[in-house]
Amino acid sequence: MAKTLYEKLFDAHVVYEAAGETPILYINRHLIHEVTSPQAFDGLRVAGRQVRQIGKTFGTMDHSISTQVRDVNKLEGQAKIQVLELAKNCEANGISLFDMQTKEQGIVHVMGPEQGLTLPGMTIVCGDSHTATHGAFGALAFGIGTSEVEHVLATQTLKQARAKSMKVEVRGKVNPGITAKDIVLAIIGKTTMAGGTGHVVEFCGEAIRDLSMEGRMTVCNMAIEFGAKAGLVAPDETTFAYLKGRPHAPKGKDWDDAVEYWKTLKSDDDAVFDSVVVLEAKDIAPQVTWGTNPGQVIGIDQVVPNPQEMADPVTKASAEKALAYIGLDANTDMKNIPVDQVFIGSCTNSRIEDLRAAAAVMKGRKKADNVKRVLVVPGSGLVKEQAEKEGLDKIFIEAGAEWRNPGCSMCLGMNDDRLGEWERCASTSNRNFEGRQGRNGRTHLVSPAMAAAAAMFGKFVDIRHVELN
């Protein structure tokens, strides 16, 4: 029987499935961080249980840490408690931890692939919704809750119901200036933020194949933003080239054997998907969100939609509420919207490719006077090291940006990088919900190049018409 890639991955990891019951999956890799793991470890202690597979669990610090200092003693309140608890729990259980004093530390969804912890064919979980990022490697990766974190620590398994399969095909090649972020925002704009609910999505088509691994990670990262359980890209030579030589990737004959297996990880030609979505790559423009969910997005060459022209009453009401919060009027030209802050970072767009794209825009330019702050936050210590080797940090600083240490930073209001009330931000992150970047902050999701251009020109501009250096 023909199978989709998702069905192959799921079936290969079923440990036990009784009639009428939810299957139990084996978990190959468990990634943990300081926010969703403390209660899970407490649960183990109370029950008198041990971590079952310490060699399959890896920790890092990212969500609540400061990107300004590397000293845990400089952290305050809950952030300090969370970081200290993670360090204590990892040490007590023999779990490998990439802490703030190591260059390998970083955002969990940047660190994992960098270290070769993310490999095709695996099941990967983490107490974070954007675990879907790792699906770019042909791994079944999804976020879990804290009680499930405890369950995986104790058993290395998880109960999981089968999802439906969705294929999203992006046909043809994108035009110059169009990035992975624009592709995935266009997908979300077409499907709406609930279009993938109940599905695992496989991204395919020439435009997806043309992407680097960094770009594929950006696309899979935001699968969750249209309701999907996980996102997938079938592994290919681009995948293998990225992984070869990584610290935790197979070596020697094990590598050769692994690649032979990984080449089988693709949907069968006659596999049946429950849902299919098709986009033409040539029609995708640089994207900017105008509302308060990622599905409220349009091309930079368009105007803010008019809720009065929306036939569906729920969509209309949502748009009216979003515009009231975001402070925009219907029919406003997207290129006439000034910004107060710019954030380049997050698990969506903080890899070296993203920083190079931003630097190409910012080189030889200065931050616009109306822009209060520009934060550039690398996704890991290794990304930071590479960027500094290439001189990108100097470009950012000379342009008037702040060059920070690795961490989740202003993606979410959980640390000391936040928007002020009613400030408007061009952000390379993945969510533009109300208050996501700080109380009453206004977030517009864009690509790194678009964010950098907004910083330099003080408003959203069409990156296709900006000279790159």
Curated annotation (Swiss-Prot):
Pathway: Amino-acid biosynthesis; L-leucine biosynthesis; L-leucine from 3-methyl-2-oxobutanoate: step 2/4. Catalyzes the isomerization between 2-isopropylmalate and 3-isopropylmalate, via the formation of 2-isopropylmaleate. It is an enzyme of class 4 (lyase). This is 3-isopropylmalate dehydratase large subunit. The gene is leuC. Keywords: 4Fe-4S, Amino-acid biosynthesis, Branched-chain amino acid biosynthesis, Iron, Iron-sulfur, Leucine biosynthesis, Lyase, Metal-binding. The keyword Translocase does not apply. Heterodimer of LeuC and LeuD. Belongs to the aconitase/IPM isomerase family. LeuC type 1 subfamily. Its EC number is 4.2.1.33. One of its GO terms (molecular function) is 4 iron, 4 sulfur cluster binding.
